[in-house]
């Protein structure tokens, strides 16, 4: 195996894959589009990855890891369940995690995960990490309900014609939390 000229090339390709998914949609992503966005020769695609499925798996695995770290960061100063409810509310209301780019990637991942078992596993692992974070303050069933609420309310918050106020979101979070 020859040495790679650019030690960051593999990571550039992974990041360009996510960019291609955002720009073109998952079904229009090609090796050529990714290589162009990454600024690498087309041959690099098959040098580092066995095919588009492996590339999508690596890209979405990277994306969900980053999202999990951002998710956990919202809870870094939380010491109790009421504090966790406040953090959940902040996460939804601030849209810091649910940026337009992140939301586009989430939509694409949801759509493809229903047809690709490996990507479904990526989704399941991501949900498990989120729920484990919440289980620091809530029992597993409540953590799962809160995680589902966060996903759904995040979608509603970024698409509603008139998003809810922070106080309205907090009341809903507290209801789900019990």
From Swiss-Prot:
GO terms, biological process: DNA-templated transcription; positive regulation of DNA-templated transcription
Iron-sulfur found in the keyword field: no
DNA-binding region in chain numbering: 30-49
UniProt-listed Gene3D superfamilies: Tetracycline Repressor, domain 2
Domain of life of the native organism: Bacteria
Functional note: Regulates the expression of a number of genes involved in biofilm formation and stress response. Target genes include six stress-response transcriptional regulators: csgD, which is a master regulator of biofilm formation, appY, sxy, ycgF, fimB and rcdA itself. This indicates that a large number of genes must be regulated indirectly via these transcriptional regulators. Acts by binding to the upstream region of its target genes.
Protein name: HTH-type transcriptional regulator RcdA
Species this protein is from: Escherichia coli (strain K12)
Gene that this sequence comes from: rcdA
């Amino acid at each position: 195996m020859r040495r790679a000229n650019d030690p960051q090339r593999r990571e550039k390709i992974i990041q360009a894959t996510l960019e291609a998914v955002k720009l073109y949609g998952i079904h229009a992503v090609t090796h050529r589009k990714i290589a162009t966005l990454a600024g690498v020769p087309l041959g690099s695609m098959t040098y580092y990855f066995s095919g588009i499925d492996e590339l999508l798996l690596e890209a979405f695995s990277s994306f969900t890891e980053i999202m999990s770290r951002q998710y956990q960061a919202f809870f870094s100063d939380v010491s109790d369940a009421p504090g966790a409810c406040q953090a959940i509310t902040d996460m939804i209301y601030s849209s810091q995690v649910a940026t337009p780019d992140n939301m586009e990637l989430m939509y694409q991942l949801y759509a493809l995960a229903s047809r690709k078992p490996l990507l479904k596993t990526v989704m399941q692992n991501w949900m498990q990490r989120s729920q484990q974070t919440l289980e620091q303050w809530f029992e597993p069933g409540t953590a799962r309900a809160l995680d589902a609420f966060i996903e759904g309310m995040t979608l509603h918050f970024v698409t509603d014609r008139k998003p809810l106020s922070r106080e309205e979101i907090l009341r809903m979070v507290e209801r789900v939390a019990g």
